[in-house]
Amino acid sequence: MAPSHPAFQFWIHLYLWCLLLMPAVLAQQGSHTHAEDRLFKHLFGGYNRWARPVPNTSDVVIVRFGLSIAQLIDVDEKNQMMTTNVWLKQEWNDYKLRWDPAEFGNITSLRVPSEMIWIPDIVLYNNADGEFAVTHMTKAHLFFTGTVHWVPPAIYKSSCSIDVTFFPFDQQNCKMKFGSWTYDKAKIDLEQMERTVDLKDYWESGEWAIINATGTYNSKKYDCCAEIYPDVTYYFVIRRLPLFYTINLIIPCLLISCLTVLVFYLPSECGEKITLCISVLLSLTVFLLLITEIIPSTSLVIPLIGEYLLFTMIFVTLSIVITVFVLNVHHRSPSTHNMPNWVRVALLGRVPRWLMMNRPLPPMELHGSPGLKLSPTYHWLETNMDAEEREETEEEEEEEEDENICMCAGLPDSSMGVLYGHGSLHLRAMGPEAKTPSQASEILLSPQIQKALEGVHYIADHLRSEDADSSVKEDWKYVAMVVDRIFLWLFIIVCFLGTIGLFLPPFLAGMI
């Protein structure tokens, strides 16, 4: 018994309809293929691809031209050229390629190899590598009205004048000039499809951004020929993306400059100022060797980053020279140099106040008692308290004056010295002529005590001399510190102004 399921019946009917319609479809396809074959024979049977597609030789072929950019591949600053991947949109009318669609199976368009038809010899005038014309001959799209639409792709290396003054914040203006190489304006004339470059299919570059891309129509008479030749020139305004160079060039330079400033904050006693300067200079030299390939190698102008690197190099070199001078001042002493009066007045008095530097007090003045200071007179063993007691006892000593004179008269004169009250020693010969009122307080001492007191005097003089030398040395050290502080602030200001000078010109030019 045959199956009666509705689905089975549906598939049976569909199969029968396919068998009935397939011959008609195949016949129609065969007719379309046959019509396309007939159309090819009709169009290219007696077609001459070398002749201009005009009925009269005086007619002008109007070529509508447009440009679409797919990728900005590279901008070579050293070789002064721009590499782009573009599509050349060209459209013209060929009266020999017209047909009636009704006679050829309603075929309204046809795609044919571009080698079979006449095409305009549009080339890139400012080419930089020898490939002036299109190398990949794609198919052209023909329409029954005779309109030919041809969009070949091409990779061009065009000459471009690169201005790297504001590198890496630079903006370039490159052009691509297209025109017929052999036909003048009386044979071929150009029209722009669009006034701007088509950016719909543009693939963004990681280094450059297209700010503007416009085209202009020009007619020019060259020295070689009497005819006028038309061209369409496209101007690309491109701006460099500075992030890569900011991270790899500018920030390291700023850090090196900061290290140079810190040299003047490092104390001279540590002995590492010159080491730090040389280390910074060596690091900058190695850094310059590494970035030689990054900076555009051109002698037309000095790039902004090159000026900043040169500024940093001079900056570091000057810091070394100044550091050597500061160390020389720091280690001066009274035995080698005398401090001029203007240095004492300016660098020990006025300049520290301007720099807000407060010199700490000496330890004797900071911690000592007022009653324990040494006196510069011959009473150097006395204290202020002793001096007051001495003044109080002067009257008592005057009363004992006669008795002391009597005691001195009975002692030998040749081997004794005298000691004034409270330890003041005078070496003199004693005799009858010494018995005067001014010598009433003299006390005779033995030679051993005299030698001991002479030794004490020598030690005291030596200590005073060392104290004076130490004071002068401390003054020289403080002068070195003041000079360090002067150049610290000076280098901070110069570093700040140099950094502002790096960013301000491109900012004012609208490139940042």
Swiss-Prot record:
Reaction catalysis annotation: Ca(2+)(in) = Ca(2+)(out); K(+)(in) = K(+)(out); Na(+)(in) = Na(+)(out)
Alphabetized GO MF terms: acetylcholine receptor activity; acetylcholine-gated monoatomic cation-selective channel activity; heterocyclic compound binding; quaternary ammonium group binding
Keyword list, A-Z: Cell membrane, Disulfide bond, Glycoprotein, Ion channel, Ion transport, Ligand-gated ion channel, Membrane, Receptor, Signal, Synapse, Transmembrane, Transmembrane helix, Transport
Signal peptide: 1-27
Residues with glycosylation annotation: N56, N106, N212
Topological domains annotated Cytoplasmic: 330-485
Membrane topology: Multi-pass membrane protein
GO annotations of cellular component type: acetylcholine-gated channel complex; cation channel complex; cell periphery; intercellular bridge; neuron projection cytoplasm; neurotransmitter receptor complex; nucleoplasm; postsynaptic membrane
Broad class of the protein's primary localization: membrane
Entry keyword Heme: no
Membrane-spanning parts: 242-266, 274-292, 308-329, 486-504
Subcellular localization: Synaptic cell membrane; Cell membrane
Keyword check for Transport: yes
Extracellular-side segments: 28-241
InterPro entries membership: Neur_chan_lig-bd, Neur_chan_lig-bd_sf, Neur_channel, Neuro-gated_channel_TM_sf, Neuro_actylchol_rec, Neurotrans-gated_channel_TM, Neurotransmitter_ion_chnl_CS, Nicotinic_acetylcholine_rcpt
Cystines in this chain: C160-C174, C224-C225
Example of a GO biological process term: cellular response to nicotine
Pfam family, any one: Neur_chan_LBD
Assembly and interaction partners: Neuronal AChR is composed of two different types of subunits: alpha and non-alpha (beta). CHRNA2/alpha-2 subunit can be combined to CHRNB2/beta-2 or CHRNB4/beta-4 to give rise to functional receptors. Both CHRNA2:CHRNB2 and CHRNA2:CHRNB4 nAChR complexes are heteropentamers with two subtypes: LS (low agonist sensitivity) with a (CHRNA2)3:(CHRNB2/4)2 and HS (high agonist sensitivity) with a (CHRNA2)2:(CHRNB2/4)3 stoichiometries; the subtypes differ in their subunit binding interfaces which are involved in ligand binding.
Family note: Belongs to the ligand-gated ion channel (TC 1.A.9) family. Acetylcholine receptor (TC 1.A.9.1) subfamily. Alpha-2/CHRNA2 sub-subfamily.
Protein purpose: Component of neuronal acetylcholine receptors (nAChRs) that function as pentameric, ligand-gated cation channels with high calcium permeability among other activities. nAChRs are excitatory neurotrasnmitter receptors formed by a collection of nAChR subunits known to mediate synaptic transmission in the nervous system and the neuromuscular junction. Each nAchR subunit confers differential attributes to channel properties, including activation, deactivation and desensitization kinetics, pH sensitivity, cation permeability, and binding to allosteric modulators.
Protein name (database record): Neuronal acetylcholine receptor subunit alpha-2
Organism from which the protein derives: Mus musculus
Gene (UniProt): Chrna2
